[in-house]
């Protein structure tokens, strides 16, 4: 598996506009992008690497993204990145106040994500709603085991 690290200067104008809008300013948009895409999503992708190693190549699902977000969160906590996590959390809360909820009434976020993964993953507004919502959920989950415990549990090691 390969992790592609996006660089701010290589983003398309539309992507920069998205981050500027979600961050509230050009400066904040660049910080938002850096915190998530050059920071948090690196250990998040480590979570997907663990999934691939343990279970093989699985199609994207809500559960897979949740595990990757848990790994990303607990990796940063293990490495003393609480201040960066708090900054990400604050951005995520702001973004969730901006993005419309794409999930139809009568469906859960998980059902919608699983049934529409290809469409969801190709739309930054919908995918953002789901990813930033999961980030908030994981950040607030006080029952979540630490990084080492999550890895051992996923691999079936006691």
Q: Can you name each region flagged by the protein language model?
A:
Residues 1-34, 49:
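Active-site scaffold of zinc-dependent metalloenzymes
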Residues 4, 38, 143:
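Functionally constrained cores in energy, signaling, and assembly domains
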Residues 29-41, 58-66:
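Soluble non-cytosolic domains of exported or imported proteins
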Residues 40-53, 69, 73:
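Active-site recognition of the HExxH zinc-binding catalytic motif
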Residues 55-56, 104:
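Surface-exposed, polar/charged faces of alpha-helical domains
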Residues 61-78:
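An active-site-proximal "capping" alpha-helix that borders the catalytic cofactor pocket
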Residues 78-158:
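Long, well-structured alpha-helical subdomains associated
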């Amino acid at each position: 598996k390969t992790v592609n690290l996006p660089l701010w200067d290589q983003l398309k104008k539309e992507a920069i506009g998205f981050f500027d809008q979600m961050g509230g300013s050009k400066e904040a948009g660049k910080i938002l992008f850096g915190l998530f895409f050059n920071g948090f999503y690196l250990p998040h992708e480590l979570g997907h690497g663990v999934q691939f190693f343990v279970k093989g190549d699985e199609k994207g699902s809500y559960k897979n993204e949740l595990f990757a977000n848990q790994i990303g969160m607990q990796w940063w906590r293990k490495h003393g990145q609480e201040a960066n996590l708090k900054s990400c959390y604050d951005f995520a809360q702001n973004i969730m106040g901006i993005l419309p909820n794409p999930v139809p009434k009568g469906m859960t976020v998980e059902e919608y994500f699983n049934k529409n993964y290809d469409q969801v993953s190709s739309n930054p507004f919908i995918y953002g709603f789901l990813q930033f919502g999961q980030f908030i959920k994981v950040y607030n989950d006080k029952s979540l085991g630490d990084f080492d415990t999550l890895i051992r549990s996923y691999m079936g090691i006691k």
